Structures are given as structure tokens and as C-alpha cells.
Amino acid sequence: MKTIIIDNQELEVDSAMTLLQACEVASIEVPRFCYHERLSIAGNCRMCLVEVVGGPPKPTASCAMQVRDLRPGPNGEPPMVKTKSEMVKKAREGVMEFLLINHPLDCPICDQGGECDLQDQAMAYGVDFSRFREAKRATEDLNLGPLVETHMTRCISCTRCVRFTTEVAGITQMGQTGRGEDAEITSYLGETLNSNLQGNIIDLCPVGALTSKPYSFTARPWELKKTETIDVMDAMGSAIRVDTKGREVMRILPINHDAVNEEWISDKTRFVWDGLRRQRLDRPYLRENGKLRESTWPEALQLAKSKLQGGKVFGLAGDLASVESIFALKQLIVELNGGFECRLDGAKLPNDFRGAYAGTAVIEDLDEAEHIMIIGSNPRDEAPVLNARIRKAWAGGANIELVGPASDLTYDYEHVGKNRAALTKLLKRPLNNKIKDKKSVIVVGIGAINEEDGYGVLSLISEIADSSDSKILIMHTAASRVGAMDIGFVHDGDWIEAVKNSDVVYNLGADEINIEAGPFVIYQGSHGDCGAHRADLILPSASYTEESGLFVNLEGRVQLAHRANFAPGDAKENWAILRALSNELDKKLPYDNLTELREALFGKFDHLFHAVRP
């Protein structure tokens, strides 16, 4: 620790901190464009200049100078830094004037307007005149693909996008060429970006040079209602903000959550909102003479009642269902003496104790891991944000091993093999220097445990974990899976045979399976997907942004999602549909609202009470 004085405020900070970080500890605002706490230091925008008393005669870039480099005063007094002196004020005005020399006056038509760092800092630290009389520089826009829109005349060369794609996303397709006035950000050889994290450069760009192509010219930020909630496109449970205008979702942005997604989200999460408007089920349908026709809720519920009474019933829980809706379905099917299952990906995960399906590691363990073993998973595709964590560990010196098909994971790894023999080899090998006395995490993909011998493979992995003192992280691919297993939504025998032998299958949003001809299928879901095409009766429900609910992510973290907008047409919340159906069946579920449902849920599974808000 070292004592320094910033603007006459004395404080003790870690000597490894930069001056900018020390200013943040002292709650002193220092403007910046190129600096970002999750990227390497570039020091090229010069907006964060401060005065070091007794130091260099010129202002110093606070993002690049560490506290340990400060010299004490002539009499041994603590080093002194000024952020509001006349020297600093003039330096910032000069830097801002240079930044605006070639910047176009696009603010009225720029998508970044209203949330632009350049606008805010020009108002706070700039001047109200320009001495530049020459023609502004013109640059050609880049084609980075269908997701990221470019307006390169607005670029201020902060290089955040270059550093993110190189350091976090792990691709080398962007860089800076030229010097001085000829410097420009470009993609090498005119390539489009090949990353499922590329949308994050839109958030990182401090100006309007990189914007969202699907969102372009659709709304202004002050027109949008902002709701903090949880992503369900994978099992990580990333914290997100859903921005809505009226009844429509306009965009999805990440929220900083160090323990889960840091401040990144995958492109699937970011751009899925356009699918919330298409192929929506907005009214009940029933099948007559092989064709679906529009129906009404009373007619649909009566038909469901007639089919559910007296027949064998089996319930399926899809990937996006909340814990409350699965709990309500379970209670209803128990009343009907039926069965149910949530492991529709075929994962051989025992339900005996929570560690068997929720693992023993948390996502943050990857940050400190010195050895990571990936078994039967491609995290780059299955959970891109988690893959970025593994890459960060690799960049910090962690050793990575892979058992499974080799692929480009954006980091180096030792390919041990791709079958069960490779696991046996790992179990029999002596604890070498790669693992011995090191923090180790085993990432287990569903691909490793969804075959016939899945239980045996999982047992083998557990033996490897025990012998190497490793933690296990199960790479679930469905947001609903851990929560459903928490409440016991599993079948003891072969659920595929149970579905075939059922008279009625109640499908709660499961679009990832094919149900063979035979049973009467009731599909409760939000989109006209595979499940709706097979259904004999469709009950339209809300999507994940249209209802509040609990989700449990792959590490077992209980999270609370909030409703951002309302469902279209006659679609209802999932739990409310099941409650209404139970009333028709004279097997009334004991709750009339979501609060009462949660009280019943927490009464049986009290660990779900401690939900973490996004």
C-alpha cells in the first residue's frame, strides 16, 4: 500500500494501481475513452491526463502510470496528483479539440446519441469553438457482417474494439493501420467478424462508429423502458437489460455481473429480440381433420380437460421454462397420476444430490484455475461468455486439456483424446506437475454424458476429480434444467418409452424433441416452432421477457427474471394457464397469483428462496 494525495485528499491505495484507478477509489471522476477495466491499457486517447506535482513537466496519462512510479516530495511527503488544475483543464480541452477535428456532426442521426461518451465529455471538458478550418477526413465504412454497423468517420481510434476482439473474443480480424491522420481501424483483408461475441464491441465503442445493425434508426434511448432481467439463451444466466418501446422489445444489453457474465453477452442473447416478434402464438389452436384452426380459451380448456381425464399423462419441460411454471405442471401431473421429465437432451444426470447435476464449482473458479479440463463440450458454441472466462484463465497461465472433438476454442489446449479411453488414461496417469497442488476445474459437457453409458462416464469423471482434487462444472445447455431438477421434475425409467405409451403428452415449451405419432399432444408455448407443428392443441403462453420467473443457472445460482413487456393477443403467463386448467379438471392448484405460487414453491424447496436479482 502507498499513501498519495489526490486533489488535497490523502488516501492509501495499492501501489500496483494506476493513477486513474486511484482516482476512482477517491470518487474523483477522470474522463477517458480508450481505457476499459477489462482490457489491456492502450493510453492512446490522452483524455485522462492529470498533473503529477514534482513529476514530468507535461500532464501524465493516468491510465498508464502506476502509483508505484510516483516519487515522494522533497521532504518525504506523499506524492501529489491534481485532476482539476489549470494545466489539466487546458490539456483536456486541447485533446478534445483534436478528437473533434475530423468528427462529423452526425449527432441528430447517430444511434449513439443520448448515450455517447464523446457528447458527454465534450460538454463537460471541451470548448465551444473550433480552430480547424480545413476539410475533414473521410473514411470508407467497413463491412463487419450482418450484426455490427460501421460509420468509420466517427471513429476516434480508441482501439477498444481491436483489443476486445484480440484479447477477449480471441480472433485476430481487426487492427489499426497507418499513422497520424492516415491511421484507421480496419478488418484485415476485408473479412467479416467470425465471433459469437462480436456484438460487445457495440457497447465498448465510446462513439457512434460501431452500432447495432438490426437496431439502427428504430428508437432513441430516452424513449425506451429499461428492465433488468436474466438471459435464458444458455444456462449461464447472464444479467441483461431489456429495452422496450410499447409492447415490443427493441434491444438487449448486458449488465455488469462479475460472478457470472462480467459485462459481456453472446450474440445470440443480444440479437434474439427480433425472434420475439415473429411466429408468435397469440391465440389457442386445435387440430381438426389434420389442420390447426383458431379456437378460444374456453373451448381449448374443455378439450384439454376431456383428454387429460382418465388417460395416461406425461409432462415435458422445455429449455426456457421458469421454475414456477415447471412446479405448477408437476403438481398438476401428480394429481393426474402421470410422469414427467426435463432431461430432454438425454443427459444421464442423477437426481440423488445437488452436486451431481449442479456441479461443485462456480463460474468464478475459472478465473483462479491453474488447470482446466474440458470433457465433451465445445464452450465456444455452447456458452461463449464462459469460453471467454476460460480464455482469460489461459492467458493468465492456466493449462487447458480437452477430451472430445478438436475445434478452435480461441486458445491453445492439449488434445488428450475424444472417447472414453482417453478418460481412463487420465484416471490412470500419475498426478504430474500440470495438476499436482494446483487449482483445477473440470468442465463437463452434456455431450459426454448423454449416451447409453452416460452414468458410467460421469462416474469416471468424478473419480478423476477426486484423484486430482478438482472441482466439476456441468456445462448445461438449457436455462431450465437445473431448476427443474431442483424440484424433482425427473422420471425414474426410460422417459422416451413413457412418452410413446402415454395417451396425452403435455409439452411445456419443449421444441427440441420429436414426439412420434400416437399420443394426443398439448403444446403450451410462445412460438410456432417444432412443438406447435406436432401439437393437437396449442395453448399460447408468454415468452421469457413477458413474465417474471425464477431460473437456476448451471452453477446452481438462483436468479430472478423480471417481466419487460406483455404477451401478444390472448397469450397468458405459463403458470396462469396451468392454474386455469387445474380448475377445469376439478384439481385446483392452491394459489391464485404468482406470490402465492412462490410461497408454495419455497415451502417445499426453501433453497430457492434466496434468489439473486440481476
Model-derived regions: residue spans:
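Acidic, glycine-enriched active-site microenvironments
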Residues: I5, C48, C63
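Short acidic beta-strand-loop surface patches of small beta-rich interaction domains
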Residues: S40-N44, L49-P56
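Non-catalytic alpha/beta scaffold blocks inside enzyme catalytic domains
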Residues: F340, L344-V612
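Structured interaction patches on ligand/partner-binding surfaces of diverse proteins
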Residues: C63-P72
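N-terminal export/assembly segments and adjacent metallocofactor-ligating motifs
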Residues: M1-A16, Q21-E24, R32, H36, ...
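Short, glycine-/polar-rich solvent-exposed loops and beta-turns at beta-strand/coil boundaries
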Residues: Y35-N44, Q66, R179
